[in-house]
Amino acid sequence: TKIGDKPWIAKFQKRGDSFPECRVELATMRLASECGLDVPPLDFRCVLDRDIYLIERFDRIPHGNWLERRPFASGLTMLGAHESEVSSFSYADLAGAIRQFGTKVLQDLHELFRRMLLNILVTNDDDHLRNHGFLFDG
């Protein structure tokens, strides 16, 4: 979706959902930002009594009437893994991919470590290779 001239990802509350997933995810991302992690701009709306959690797209660059796609690959792709193998990979494997493919290795390793700590502290049960990614910035 678009807000102003920028593209955003919208996550909607499920009908009949008693757990406020959108609000929890927003609060967790704001906590991540307060902890110094690299977090895109966030927003929250409530429309017709349904929560909408918004994240500004970090993988698109607006150019007038069109959007340039920033090259992106998930941790799963960067490790050459298959969905059925995700449980056999770890943060150490992601760190290895950063060392192998990264251009800001020390900065990105620090970011990965801080993300790992936050995920542990908030008991993130959705921490998997698809939720870690690499952006080409060259």
Mark where each language-model region is:
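Conserved ATP-binding subdomain of kinase catalytic cores across diverse folds
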Residues: 1-88
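Conserved kinase catalytic-core segment
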Residues: 19-31, 90-138
